[in-house]
């Protein structure tokens, strides 16, 4: 019997309190009785098995016996959770066989067009956590070079099919999605209660922030519970015609969540990958009609009208193939929408609009009404062109606020702290003039530096928008934080680049013309 054929020594599982994102990581002692240098090395892939249950992980080697002993196998939190066995359970560890679908990834890198079967195999292996982050990155980079229309359709279909697939016993199920990048912009939390109050079905699932100071789910969580199950979601929609929940908890298109976790650090955001991400989730969600908000601006994800047109054609192409009526609308992406950036501040804006507060941000109110109007006109009983008037009626009558409260009551109370950060700092204008530009990316960075979205009361409140006159020393915005170090970091970053451009009135007029 060769050493390779000998029975493998068993190791006891030990939980290591280490958050490794979405990647499965195992840790083994260099003195482990199961470690053979000719087989195992750092960052190799291993299969951990107990009877018929197994999980693949990336292996790290340690010399610290206090972390993992010679008779133990450490599992970081994600791997421990997925394996689902208690600490102390005996397991075997063996070299992992690379997924067959990696051959297709190599082919894509070399410029080959993949078949639908190959793309399906890749997505299936992704969702079974058979790929390391490096292997996922290889697939993303290969796909970023080029993707045919058939490959795009195959990717959308495969991603939609591996998670939860919702079906609704209603002829029209509307949805709205913004491609993101604009601070504030919490239109979904206003248009969902408007549309639901009208009687259309709008089961809205949203994401948490990844690189922004707040996602819709983070902001809604200030007001209500968002981590509901599929069964609870269906009950909420039956009672309210709509919901505002975190999509990650109902497991729509889990492959997309995995891909996004690797895309963002690599700054990969191609049109095809963006469309595949959005459309796979809408297909899985059972949407029949989709409105896509495309903000256009110099620091938005879409920089020009030409880019917006190309993206529109791609959304419509995929929608036509899968039987989803897709409408895109280009909106102003030159500056934030609303006055708040950060979960609590954005929730305050939303409730001010729904409550018809005279001080509510007019830009957020108007954009929400405009988007809601498009969705309402999917109702065949509503006269064409009457959507805006109906949306305004539902908002001004208080029906939308009442519907929002009903949604909040059905989703359950929030357990989040709603206080604003107690440490503040105002960023002021350096000269007299007119605000001519606002850098959305920089304001997002500053709000995150201040602690958002982890600290829901951290962020930025804006006092000035593009076109507003300012005097030297007048506040442009206020930073909110809880942690003194985060406040100081945000203030220092704002001194280097505050995100505002102030020009004299004549220069501003020339730019506008």
UniProtKB/Swiss-Prot annotation:
GO process terms (BP): pyrimidine nucleobase metabolic process; pyrimidine nucleoside metabolic process
Output the Pfam families linked to this UniProt entry: Glycos_trans_3N, Glycos_transf_3, PYNP_C
The enzyme's main class, written as a single word, is transferase
Question: Sorted alphabetically, which InterPro entries does this protein's record hold?
Answer: Glycosyl_Trfase_fam3, Glycosyl_Trfase_fam3_N_dom, Glycosyl_Trfase_fam3_N_dom_sf, Nuc_phospho_transferase, PYNP-like_C_sf, PYNP_C, Pyrmidine_PPase_CS, Thym_Pase_Put
UniProt keyword terms in alphabetical order: Glycosyltransferase, Transferase
Presence of the UniProt keyword Transferase in the record = yes
Kindly list the GO CC terms recorded for this protein.
cytosol
What family, per the record?
Belongs to the thymidine/pyrimidine-nucleoside phosphorylase family. Type 2 subfamily.
Query: What is this protein called in UniProt?
Result: Putative thymidine phosphorylase
Recorded source organism is: Rhodopseudomonas palustris (strain BisB18)
Query: Source organism lineage?
Result: Bacteria, Pseudomonadati, Pseudomonadota, Alphaproteobacteria, Hyphomicrobiales
């Amino acid at each position: 019997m060769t050493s390779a054929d000998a029975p493998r020594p068993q190791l006891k599982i030990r939980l290591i309190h280490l958050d490794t994102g979405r990647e499965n990581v195992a840790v083994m002692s260099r003195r482990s009785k199961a470690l053979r240098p000719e087989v195992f090395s750092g960052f190799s892939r291993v299969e951990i098995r107990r009877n018929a249950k197994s999980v693949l992980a990336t292996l790290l080697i340690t010399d610290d016996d206090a972390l993992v002993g010679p008779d133990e196998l450490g599992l970081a939190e994600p791997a421990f959770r997925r394996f689902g066995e208690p600490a102390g359970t005996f397991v075997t560890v063996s070299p992992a066989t690379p997924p067959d679908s990696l051959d297709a990834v190599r082919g894509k890198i070399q410029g080959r067009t993949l078949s639908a079967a190959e793309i399906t195999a890749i997505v299936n292996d992704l969702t079974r956590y058979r790929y390391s982050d490096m292997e996922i990155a290889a697939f993303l980079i290969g796909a970023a070079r080029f993707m045919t229309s058939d490959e795009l359709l195959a990717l959308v279909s495969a991603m939609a099919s591996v998670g939860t697939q919702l079906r609704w016993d209603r002829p029209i199920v509307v949805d709205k999605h913004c491609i993101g990048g604009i601070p504030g912009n919490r239109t979904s939390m206003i248009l969902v209660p408007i549309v639901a109050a009208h009687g259309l079905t709008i089961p809205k699932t949203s994401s948490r922030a990844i690189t922004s100071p707040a996602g819709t789910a983070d902001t809604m969580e200030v007001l209500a519970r968002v981590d509901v199950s599929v069964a609870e979601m269906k009950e909420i929609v039956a009672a309210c015609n709509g919901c505002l929940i975190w999509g990650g908890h109902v497991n729509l298109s889990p492959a997309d969540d995995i891909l996004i976790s690797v895309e963002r650090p690599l700054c990969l955001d191609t049109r095809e990958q963006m469309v595949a991400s959005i459309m796979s989730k809408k297909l899985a969600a059972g949407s029949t009609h989709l409105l896509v908000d495309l903000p256009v601006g110099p620091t938005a994800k879409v920089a020009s009208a030409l880019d917006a047109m190309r993206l529109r054609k791609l959304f419509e192409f995929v929608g036509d193939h899968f039987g989803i009526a897709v409408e895109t609308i280009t909106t102003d992406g030159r500056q934030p929408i609303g006055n708040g950036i950060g979960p609590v501040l954005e929730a305050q804006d939303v409730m001010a609009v729904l409550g018809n507060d005279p001080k509510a941000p007019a830009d957020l109110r108007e954009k929400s009404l405009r988007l809601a109007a498009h969705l309402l006109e999917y109702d065949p009983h509503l006269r064409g062109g009457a959507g805006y008037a109906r949306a305004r009626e539902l908002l001004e009558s208080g029906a939308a606020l009442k519907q929002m409260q009903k949604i909040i009551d059905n989703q359950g109370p929030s357990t989040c702290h709603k206080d604003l950060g107690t440490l503040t700092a105002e960023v002021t204008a350096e000269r007299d003039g007119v605000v001519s530009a606002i850098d959305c990316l920089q304001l997002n960075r500053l709000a995150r530096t201040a602690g958002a979205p982890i600290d829901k009361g951290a962020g930025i409140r804006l006092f000035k928008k593009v076109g507003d006159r300012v005097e030297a020393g007048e506040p442009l915005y206020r930073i909110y934080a809880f942690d003194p170090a985060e406040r100081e970091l945000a203030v220092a970053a704002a001194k280097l680049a505050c995100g505002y451009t102030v020009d004299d009135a004549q220069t501003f007029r020339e730019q506008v013309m």
